[in-house]
């Protein structure tokens, strides 16, 4: 398909920070950009949002869902926390199975929420949706071996069966230790945002490789420049306008208080016997700040994330407004 001036939307993983993406979607609606979206690529929570944006569309409904229902995702899987489950997990470790532990969260709750939000029939006029995942091919202690994983792209709108579409979305968001791996057609899949295993937490590649009909790519990242200062690697984006939308301030939840207990790395560097630990402390503090927002599945935090996504989305994307929208604003 030839380039028609459309928009490709990229949604990263980030757990509860998916609420930020919902706010950006609301901003895109108010700026008159949604009808230009031709394809959406998402990983993990970004895949769930991609499907909701394409099939549900209504930003108010989606934002309300994030503010009032998404916290249910954090429901623990009590069966997997039992002593018997822990015993079986230890046996699996000794047997060398790829995923010796079951997920700590109840996947059936997430499945129920998606069924509640999503229509049974996929809209024929919806943008293309690509959900990225990692196929786990097993092997001895495969969870520690990057060669045991292979990237997988699910084209959600091309799957006619609603239940299989659901499982493909869950497969993209099956974060290890959080949710059990998802089995589809005899293959097991885990969260596609697991960069350390070859995943792509900012799934730009599917848009660049498979969507020639877009001239503008909007990339919504979950982490602020304070945490993730590295610029986006966008090889192959020549000739396209690439716009990043990221939090202007770090998305923090209650867990953020723990980062304050990490000693200052610069202070540690001045102590010869502890200096080698300094870089590790920086990494630990950074990871705690990332997790702070990722696991902030409480209504207050997610409402803040929605508001921040809306504000940051308006600021970053205002220049993409159609000219007729600009004219109305100046009346």
What do these predicted regions represent?
Residues 1-41, 52-331:
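Patatin-like phospholipase
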Residues 42, 46:
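Gly/Ala-rich beta-loop-alpha elbow adjacent to hydrolase catalytic centers
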Residues 47-51:
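Long, contiguous secondary-structure blocks with strong helical propensity
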